[in-house]
């Protein structure tokens, strides 16, 4: 029997101020990609009481979408559910300030004509697109769940999605968009054995009693519903500690309660702290930015490695130099869970996956408006939407390569 340990991950709803910003940035990105798939986009958003500020750099031929950014912003805020001043924010009446310039020509030079082409004379078209920045990105997969994600973050996301669902479908019509969930799981070694604690904080209308209404209804319609659907083989969910709105009241929320920024929930977006993170955020960035596209590719790699049975869990790191197509480094960690030599796994990854930025964009078909749905509830292991980096299309190739 291994020593019991507790691990915690959190999620937030789409109405959290930081997630509003991620959603706005990705909605602008999608609108521009729909009009011009080759758009270069780096959009950051800030929200605060009554105001939205959208700034960054864009180079695009999608002139109509660019001119309509203000409406794109308002529509996404209203879709999230901030449609009245009673909720602390209103997409119809809030101020929207746009401050967007063009992408730096120095950066564009390195992306458009990579070092391999510019200096080395490479003829392969995939050698012509360089990485949009230097950096390191991680991907991870583990056999904790059917979606090959760590259980704590997977469960936290399910709770957040359910919280939004019962708000939007009217089951609990007094809920407001802002909310957070947190899950603590007890592990025996690497096996999740017991759900220890669930923390759920949700914005609500004024006058709602915590003990007599909010807590029992959240437990019934959100927590119990999610745990019933979970059906995990090793996890005991029979008696968790449940904390609903432990401050006692959560009426003031959204941008009125806290300012929000794009890219401030990078652990929520990825693996809930279970795996390492290279530091780069995703939302508002087109796929020429390896912060986003290479992190997606690493998840694709890791998920296929685990699905192929080469390891029960794997973390893969890739690194790039700005303006260069080929990665400068690849690192594979299997934490002793491998079924074949890790050196063979690393070699097989190099043979099966082309990790040049242009190849990633091609193989995952990333020049499409597919990003707005990823802005909340995680970019990986999604069970509610289909994402190209979640496909298991390289399993047989990996098995053959090792």
Curated annotation (Swiss-Prot):
Chain sites annotated for binding ATP: 16, 178-180, 249-250, 258, 264-265, 281, 285
Entry's localization field: Cytoplasm
Binding site for Mg(2+): 18
Catalytic activity: L-methionine + ATP + H2O = S-adenosyl-L-methionine + phosphate + diphosphate
Annotated region (Flexible loop), positions in chain: 103-113
Annotated K(+) binding sites: 44
Enzyme class, spelled out: transferase
Highest taxon in the source lineage: Bacteria
Any one GO MF annotation of this record: ATP binding
Primary localisation category: cytoplasm
Annotated InterPro entries: ADOMET_SYNTHASE_CS, S-AdoMet_synt_C, S-AdoMet_synt_central, S-AdoMet_synt_N, S-AdoMet_synthetase, S-AdoMet_synthetase_sfam
Record note on cofactor: Binds 2 divalent ions per subunit. Binds 1 potassium ion per subunit.
Keyword Nucleus: no
Cited PROSITE patterns: ADOMET_SYNTHASE_1, ADOMET_SYNTHASE_2
Biochemical pathway: Amino-acid biosynthesis; S-adenosyl-L-methionine biosynthesis; S-adenosyl-L-methionine from L-methionine: step 1/1
NCBIfam families cross-referenced by the UniProt entry: metK
Function: Catalyzes the formation of S-adenosylmethionine (AdoMet) from methionine and ATP. The overall synthetic reaction is composed of two sequential steps, AdoMet formation and the subsequent tripolyphosphate hydrolysis which occurs prior to release of AdoMet from the enzyme.
Protein name: S-adenosylmethionine synthase
Gene that specifies this protein: metK
């Amino acid at each position: 029997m291994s020593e019991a340990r507790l691990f915690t991950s959190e999620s937030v709803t789409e109405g959290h101020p930081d997630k509003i910003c991620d959603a706005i940035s990705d909605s602008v990105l999608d609108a521009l990609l729909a009009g011009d798939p080759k758009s270069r986009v780096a959009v950051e958003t800030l929200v605060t009481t009554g105001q939205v500020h959208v700034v960054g750099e864009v180079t695009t031929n999608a002139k109509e979408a660019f001119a309509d950014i203000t409406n794109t912003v308002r529509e996404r805020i209203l879709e999230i559910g901030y449609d009245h001043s009673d909720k602390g924010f209103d997409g119809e009446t809030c101020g929207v300030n746009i401050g967007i310039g063009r992408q730096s020509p120095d950066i564009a030079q390195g992306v458009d004509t990579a070092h391999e082409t510019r200096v080395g004379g490479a003829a392969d078209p995939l050698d012509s697109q360089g990485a949009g920045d230097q950096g390191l990105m991680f991907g991870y997969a583990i056999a904790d769940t059917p979606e090959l994600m760590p259980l704590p973050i997977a469960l936290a996301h399910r709770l957040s999605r359910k919280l939004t669902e019962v708000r939007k479908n009217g089951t609990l019509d007094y809920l407001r968009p802002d909310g957070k969930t947190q899950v603590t799981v007890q592990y025996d070694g690497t096996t999740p054995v017991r759900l220890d604690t669930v923390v759920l904080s949700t914005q609500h209308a004024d006058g709602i009693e915590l003990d007599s209404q909010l807590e029992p209804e959240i437990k019934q319609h959100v927590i119990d519903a999610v745990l019933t659907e979970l059906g995990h083989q090793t996890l005991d969910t029979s008696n968790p500690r449940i904390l609903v709105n432990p401050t006692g009241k959560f009426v003031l929320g959204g941008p009125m309660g806290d300012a929000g920024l794009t890219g401030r929930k990078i652990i929520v977006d990825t693996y809930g702290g279970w795996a390492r993170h290279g530091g780069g955020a995703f939302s508002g960035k087109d796929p020429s930015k390896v912060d986003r596209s290479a992190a997606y590719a690493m998840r694709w790699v890791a998920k296929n490695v685990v699905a192929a049975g080469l390891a029960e869990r794997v973390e893969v790191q890739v690194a790039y130099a700005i303006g260069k197509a080929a990665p400068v480094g690849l690192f594979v960690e299997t934490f002793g869970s491998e079924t074949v030599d890790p050196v063979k796994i690393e070699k097989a990854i190099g043979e099966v996956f082309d990790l040049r930025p242009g190849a990633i964009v091609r193989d995952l078909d990333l020049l499409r408006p597919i990003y707005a749905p990823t802005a909340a509830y995680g970019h990986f292991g999604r069970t509610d939407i289909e994402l190209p980096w979640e496909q298991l299309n390289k399993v047989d190739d990996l098995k053959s390569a090792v």
